[in-house]
Amino acid sequence: HTDSSAASDVYKRQDPLYSPTRVLTENFLKDFNIKTTFYNPHDLKTLEKSITKKTKLIFVENPGSNSFDFQDLKKIVSIAKKNKILTTIDNTWGTPYFLKPIKLGFDMSIVSATKYYSGHSDVMGGSLAVNKKVFSKVKAAERITGLRLGPDDAYLITRGLRTLDVRLDRHSENAKKVAKFLSKFKNIKLLYPYKKGSYNFKMWKKYYSGASGLMGLKIKCKNINSVRKFVNSLKLFGYGYSWGGFESLALHQEYRETGTRKFLKLAKDEHLVRLHIGLEDPSDLIADIKQALKHLK
């Protein structure tokens, strides 16, 4: 979660954070005299303590990018309202189908339309939902900056939205079956709301009506080449970053920076692999993962 504000404003955000968002806040916003500070998503006291009179916005990513940490959303909204601070959430993972942030009290909710809204990996775009309090300011900014989708992109996203519920139900159903299979392996820590009793599961269950298809795997393996072979030997999974389409994807996040590994709580011999579970037959996906796991030594 992030808290950022300019010379007179600070912007609060969580850590870890989606890397392009991190670059935006750390490298781009500072040129506009906007300062960004971080808080621990599992310890919201760090958020409360870091708020100052200059804090203008709290930015939430739920779940956290690659960490898959879920937060207590109502508590964040409560902290923000108490201090008269605006709140924004990145709701790309859940989409409004599984989570409705504005109803929870958030001022703004952003979703990457490139992903589940489109559903076919053929569009680049985004959406912003806001409450009545900030609508006029956001609308004015939109007119000034010229944020308009092209007609073709708008058409393709509208097409995708017509099947959003059907697709997300299938993504969720498939991901749950894959998660159940992967949970049996002692050398794999599943980053997905599957393990009952965990803090992340409780926070997911408290606010979401379902789970989408993106998950992370913390794989304990001394040989990084074995992890690479595991990913490269998957036959039904494409290799790519932009998830949310109909197809399954795998990505080996080869983090080498000490800071990033610390943020993601990656041990020395742990490696992060991200899977997006698509709309294929779940038994085929599980069989594919099973044959690829033989490369982990």
What spans do the regions from the language model cover?
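Single conserved hydrophobic/aromatic residue that forms the stacking wall/gate
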Residues: 1-7
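PLP-dependent aminotransferase-like
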Residues: 8-60, 78, 82
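Buried hydrophobic positions in well-ordered alpha/beta secondary-structure cores of metabolic enzymes
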Residues: 11, 58-61, 76, 90, ...
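PLP-dependent enzyme catalytic core of the Aspartate aminotransferase-like
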Residues: 19, 26, 35-37, 49, ...
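Active-site core of PLP-dependent enzymes with the aminotransferase class I/II
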Residues: 63-86, 94-100
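Active-site PLP attachment segment
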Residues: 102, 106-164
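Structural signature of PLP-dependent enzymes
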Residues: 159-181, 208-212
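Conserved C-terminal alpha-helix-loop-beta "cap" of PLP-dependent enzymes
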Residues: 190-273, 277
